[in-house]
């Protein structure tokens, strides 16, 4: 008889789909399970529902703390995939939020930004961890950050949304032109872009915005599309399947807090600009970024930079730290990888 596994996923967004793919890939290549997939709110909040069937294990994403606690008290093997701090001693698999913040800061630094901001929610642990990583990486590079943080309500209302857009717009107006802002997630990034529009600030020319999680639908819905740090949701699911198999086999100790490294940054329109004091160098760099893999030459770059070859060489070494030819190669390698 196959083990009976309950998979509870309240949301069916892109992240959840990737996690499920990872779980199912492990299951199909290892010990088979009998799986029940549920997303009903009652299943995730009503702990008595767990007693209705003889489950052998639970993998849950965004279930209530009551549900997680009840599963633990029933001595069910359980893996919690919610992106919050560890509770009840159960095995938790989640993104490495500190690393996500680090990656966001490094991305902006590489693109030559000099002013930085973070937007998030003070009562969400993942937001706080991402801010901590972002600020830490900036400080290691000798740079500083200003933050805009509010408490996120249990239920978002139109009144709350409108108020936040207004407050955000005021904060954005107070920032230096060309500030690079990391938002704690893609939904927050969308709010920042709406607030920038309210403030009369164009994205990415006046304000660059980077999200996190890389929810493709959310990132592609608006204009401009949102650049985002991509978490490795598939690997989260694969590791969940691996650890669940060990639990079902009766192995002893299991990791309590597994953190999965992000995959990288997916660049879209909201950050697709290089912050350079020299506008001609910025134009040349943007041209290289866009056409590096199409066999462009330094002569073609010169046509966009409106300067002599010697001036271009001098300014690239000053602002970029590489010659134009090496920058073309660097951009080619970055796109391939």
Language model features with spans:
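Bacterial carbohydrate/catabolite-sensing allosteric modules
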Residues: 1-57, 66-306, 313, 334
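Terminal helix-turn-helix DNA-binding modules in bacterial transcription factors
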Residues: 299, 318-337
């Amino acid at each position: 008889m196959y083990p009976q596994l309950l998979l509870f996923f309240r949301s069916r967004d892109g992240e959840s789909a990737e996690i499920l793919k990872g779980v199912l890939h492990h299951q199909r290549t290892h010990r088979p399970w009998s799986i029940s997939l549920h997303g009903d709110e009652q299943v995730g909040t009503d702990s008595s529902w767990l007693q209705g069937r003889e489950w052998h294990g639970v993998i849950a994403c965004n279930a209530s703390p009551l549900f997680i606690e009840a599963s633990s008290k029933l001595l069910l093997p359980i893996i919690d995939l919610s992106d919050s701090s560890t509770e009840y001693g159960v095995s938790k698999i989640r993104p490495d939020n500190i690393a996500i913040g680090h990656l966001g800061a490094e991305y902006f630094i590489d693109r030559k930004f000099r002013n930085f901001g973070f937007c998030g929610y003070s009562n969400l642990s993942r937001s706080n961890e991402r801010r901590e990583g972002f600020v830490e990486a900036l400080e290691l590079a000798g740079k500083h950050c200003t933050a805009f943080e509010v408490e996120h309500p249990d239920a978002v209302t139109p009144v709350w949304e409108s108020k936040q857009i207004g407050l955000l717009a005021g904060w954005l107006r107070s920032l230096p032109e060309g500030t690079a802002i990391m938002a704690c997630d893609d939904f927050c990034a969308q709010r920042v872009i709406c607030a920038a529009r309210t403030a009369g600030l164009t994205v990415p020319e006046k304000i660059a915005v980077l999200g996190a999680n890389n929810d493709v639908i959310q990132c592609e819905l608006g204009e401009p599309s949102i650049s985002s740090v991509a978490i490795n949701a598939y690997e989260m699911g694969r590791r969940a399947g691996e650890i669940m198999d060990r639990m079902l086999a009766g192995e002893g100790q299991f990791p309590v807090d597994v953190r999965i490294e992000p995959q990288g940054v997916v660049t879209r329109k909201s950050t697709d600009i290089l912050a350079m004091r020299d506008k001609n160098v910025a134009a040349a760099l943007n041209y290289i970024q866009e056409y590096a893999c199409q066999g462009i030459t330094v002569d073609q770059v010169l046509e966009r930079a409106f300067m002599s070859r010697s001036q271009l060489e001098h300014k690239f070494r000053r602002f970029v730290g590489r010659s134009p030819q090496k920058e073309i190669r660097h951009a080619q390698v970055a796109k391939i990888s």
